[in-house]
Amino acid sequence: LLLQGGVNLLSALNDAIPLIDNPVYIKQLKQVRKEISEGKSFSDALAQFKIFPDFFVQMIRVGEEGGRLDSILADISESYDKEIEGDLKIVVRLLNRL
C-alpha cells in the first residue's frame, strides 16, 4: 500500500520493519534494506536471504522490470491473505470437531 501511495521502497521498508514480530524476518529485512541502499535490486536482495519463495521473488523481479512492483506486491499480499484465511478455516473446522 505504501508503494501504491508513492512512497519509495526504502521508506516503505523502514515503515514496515517495526511492525514485524518475528526477529528472524526483522534481521533479514534489515539486511535486504541495506543491500537495496547499496544498489542491489529488491528481488536480488530478497533472493539472497530466502524470505519469500522463489516464485514470489521471480514475480517481484518481473514487477521491477515492468515498473509494476506495487501491483505485484499487492498480488503477493492477497495470495498470502488467502492462504492464511484457508488455514484458519481448517483450524476452526478441527476445533469444532472437539
Residue ranges, per PLM feature:
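Glycine- and small-hydrophobic-enriched helix-loop-helix hairpins
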Residues: L1-L94
